[in-house]
Amino acid sequence: MAAEDVAATGADTSELESGGLLQEIFTSPLNLLLLGLCIFLLYKIVRGDQPAASDSDDDEPPPLPRLKRRDFTPAELRRFDGVQDPRILMAINGKVFDVTKGRKFYGPEGPYGVFAGRDASRGLATFCLDKEALKDEYDDLSDLTPAQQETLSDWDSQFTFKYHHVGKLLKDGEEPTVYSDKEEPKDESTRKND
């Protein structure tokens, strides 16, 4: 009988321990919070970082077709500010770049939106985001210091690497270049995607 009591006591203990563990989890607010956190994290791991379909549609407009190469006067460039035209173009050091894929930076609400549709050379070379630093006519940049010219050259390199070069900024009275449809930069694979 003593062996039966010990066996019965052992069975009762294991039943109490398993029932006690569940009871402890569901009766303690801290344990419920931790259990909920574990379930949430497990859900996020299994589900992954999939954006909701409605969020991605609102943030990103459909990509625009590639702009054919052409040259722009400062007045023609002004139209491509992301407001009048969905495409955003900027001129840097006499080169015009399509920065539409960088809309978050260069769009109307972006931190560099003042440069959209403009020659941004002087503003980038002098680190000035004021509209007063930008000129409405062609800016020959002859008054930039050597340090500012080097800064501008660095910006030019970055934009050449990252964005599509669509043409050049024309001086007053300068004739536009006639580009062939086949003329493209040599190595498109080196251009970085956003």
From Swiss-Prot:
One of its GO terms (biological process) is heme biosynthetic process. It is found in: Microsome membrane; Smooth endoplasmic reticulum membrane; Mitochondrion outer membrane; Secreted. One of its GO terms (molecular function) is metal ion binding. Residues 44-194 are cytoplasmic. Gene3D superfamilies: Cytochrome b5-like heme/steroid binding domain (3.10.120.10). Residues 50-70, 174-194 are annotated as: Disordered. Keywords: Endoplasmic reticulum, Iron, Lipid-binding, Membrane, Metal-binding, Microsome, Mitochondrion, Mitochondrion outer membrane, Phosphoprotein, Receptor, Secreted, Steroid-binding, Transmembrane, Transmembrane helix. The chain crosses the membrane at residues 25-43. It comes from the Eukaryota. GO terms for cellular component: chromosome, centromeric region; endomembrane system; endoplasmic reticulum; extracellular exosome; germinal vesicle; meiotic spindle midzone; membrane; midbody. The modification Phosphothreonine is found at residue 73. Heme binds at residue 112. It is a single-pass membrane protein. Its main location: membrane. Residues 71-170 form the Cytochrome b5 heme-binding domain. Residues 1-24 are lumenal. Coiled coil: none annotated. Component of a progesterone-binding protein complex. Binds progesterone. Has many reported cellular functions (heme homeostasis, interaction with CYPs). Required for the maintenance of uterine histoarchitecture and normal female reproductive lifespan. Intracellular heme chaperone. Regulates heme synthesis via interactions with FECH and acts as a heme donor for at least some hemoproteins. Forms a ternary complex with TMEM97 receptor and low density lipid receptor/LDLR, which increases LDLR-mediated LDL lipoprotein internalization. Non-classical progesterone receptors involved in extranuclear signaling are classified in 2 groups: the class II progestin and adipoQ receptor (PAQR) family (also called mPRs) (PAQR5, PAQR6, PAQR7, PAQR8 and PAQR9) and the b5-like heme/steroid-binding protein family (also called MAPRs) (PGRMC1, PGRMC2, NENF and CYB5D2). Belongs to the cytochrome b5 family. MAPR subfamily. Homodimer. Forms stable homodimer through hydrophobic heme-heme stacking interactions. Interacts with FECH; the interaction results in decreased FECH activity. Interacts with EGFR, CYP1A1 and CYP3A4; the interactions require PGRMC1 homodimerization. Interacts with TMEM97 and LDLR; the interaction increases LDL internalization. The cytochrome b5 heme-binding domain lacks the conserved iron-binding His residues at positions 106 and 130. This is Membrane-associated progesterone receptor component 1. It comes from Bos taurus. The gene is PGRMC1.
